[in-house]
Amino acid sequence: MSKLYGYRRYQPRTQPKYDFPFYASTAKRHPTKPLVIVPQTLSEVTGPVFGHDDVKPTDHDLTRQHAGEPIGERIIVSGRVLDESGRPVPHALVEVWQANAAGRYPHKADQHDAPLDPNFSGAGRTVTDAQGHYRFITIRPGEYPWRNHYNAWRPAHIHFSLFGRAFLTRLVTQMYFPGDPLLTLDPMYMSIPDEKARRRLVSQFDLQNTVPEHALAYRFDIVLRGRAATPMER
């Protein structure tokens, strides 16, 4: 029988702290007992993840899901999904969700006093190509207030969910935008101790993929597990 190779563990200080005093909700939901490391079995290392037939060719374009154009700055977000050894991850499911240009989510729990956009649902999905590339067309999300502390605002961000080759490469994370002054004030972003690891969550302006008179582009590469792993969301 061939040897079962497990995944490398994350580097210390590169993932968000389970209990971060400045991020209030972690106090109630973080583990209260020491974590137990369990061996990786065949089902976790090679297990199936999703059905590719669920993804439509146009699901990557969040600006074409309704009859009209959504309000806001149109942007392109693209990048590559890589494994812990730097190899492309083909046929990986990439899903995104976000607030609209006014900083409002369409779900009922969002009570932010900002307008909804009937032409923007704020969610999309795609599958990486043979070289691990993905691409979304969307609207730049707005910042919004949250009640973590006095005058708290979340920086503009896009949520990402990825399914790699197996269950252990599952990742939920957030992408931020370069130059945002709210980043250093945001407890979620700052809960990652290592500064270099935090910067992995910040996209880069991408002139090469910017479409003249149509949309600015941002690049966001994602690494599933390993020493250079993209930090997860907690």
Can you name each region flagged by the protein language model?
Residues 1-234:
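Beta-strand-dominated extracellular/periplasmic modules and repeats
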